[in-house]
Curated annotation (Swiss-Prot):
It comes from the Eukaryota. WD repeats lie at residues 106-147, 149-187, 194-233, 236-275, 278-336, 339-380, 382-425. One of its GO terms (biological process) is cell division. The keyword Cell inner membrane does not apply. It is found in: Cytoplasm, Cytoskeleton; Cytoplasm, Cytoskeleton, Spindle pole. This is Nuclear distribution protein PAC1-1. CDD domains: WD40. SUPFAM superfamilies: Lissencephaly-1 protein (Lis-1, PAF-AH alpha) N-terminal domain, WD40 repeat-like. Pfam families: LisH_PAC1 (PF24951), WD40 (PF00400).
Amino acid sequence: MSILSERQKDDLNKSIAEYLYAQDLTEIADSLCARLSLDYKSEPNSKYAGLLEKKWVSVIRLQKKLIESENRYTALQEDIAAGPARRRDAQVDWLPTAPARYTLTSHRAPITRVAFHPTFSLLASASEDTTVKIWDWETGSFERTLKGHTREVWGVDFDSKGSFLATCSSDLSIKVWDTQQWDNAGYSGKTLRGHEHTVSTVKFLPGDDLIASASRDKTIRIWEVATTFCIRMITGHEDWVRMTVPSTDGTLLGSCSSDNTARVWDPTSGVMKMEFRGHGHIVEVIAFAPLASYAAIRELAGLKAATKAPGAYIATGSRDKTVKIWDVHSGQELRTLSGHNDWIRGLVFHPSGKHLLSASDDKTIRVWELSTGRCMKVVEAHSHFITCLAWGPPVQAGGDIKAASGSGNLRGTGADTERRMNVLATGSVDQTVCVWLP
């Protein structure tokens, strides 16, 4: 019984036939086509031209990468056995320091979003050049380019298992790519259509069955991945919805907009739970605070009541050059963080819960101490505006360190602290992606 699907067998047979035709072995190729009942004629621009050779080279490259990965894993295991506690303690508060470990170049237009694969050392970058590129962040090597959108790509997100990658674009579409099918020539996955203007963000909701998207058409839409149907449209913002992001348990959905507000919604009903007003310009980015940061935020705001409910606090970044931290339940602004000299474009909470990192058009990353609101570090990161940043993937409690590779150190300081790989990625208008490692 063949392990290949019918489509894969057809692609393989046609690739072999094309190779034979290219070698002027026409009689053998014709005989093969007849024997396999294959309806195929060689053409100069056929998608099968050179495909067999490419596959062969890919296998050799994958074998080499497998050997390298096994060697890195063996070295890592030896390192852990020599002193795991000391390594964890030394790295738990790691923060990025210039210069970046890798500067990834291949895009031909500004980078718009970056996202880490949850298991492997892969990084996806979206760009205004209409493509998504996949990189190995541990080695800094380029893996592949995904082509399918016809205009700028604004958002990219992996599901929790890394089986699917969602992207969104100015071409009004959302695409869902099966990561196991990347090597198939011409594959562009499922396409979700319904937005009436640029789709600016796409996010998998916890459980991976649903996707949330935000658009310049002023709506947020919830999509069913299996059927590609839009099952809910959320309205309320008065202008372009720049970003939407779910809370860790999926019970809340945050959004921010060109109407200068941020909002929190019930994604099941579409009902708005809270509106946040205070920014004096477009709100570009929103992030839910993880449980690990709650103690520091309460200290910052002088709050006594403790809560462990996901989605209790959010941070927003705006073109007014400030970052604001809010209490979701009351809508109260807890603190404004000022220091950037230009638009805020990216926010991420440090996995230790002690810091908040922000990225700006002033070309810097700033590290804020959450308990005091003090800017404790400024990193000169890019030669042009920074458009996005992302911290490495979380490793769930009880997760095997084998899920990480190389120097992706796993960290944990308590029950509420999310263990994460110490890696940060930033994207810029300078058309590069920077990878920051210890």
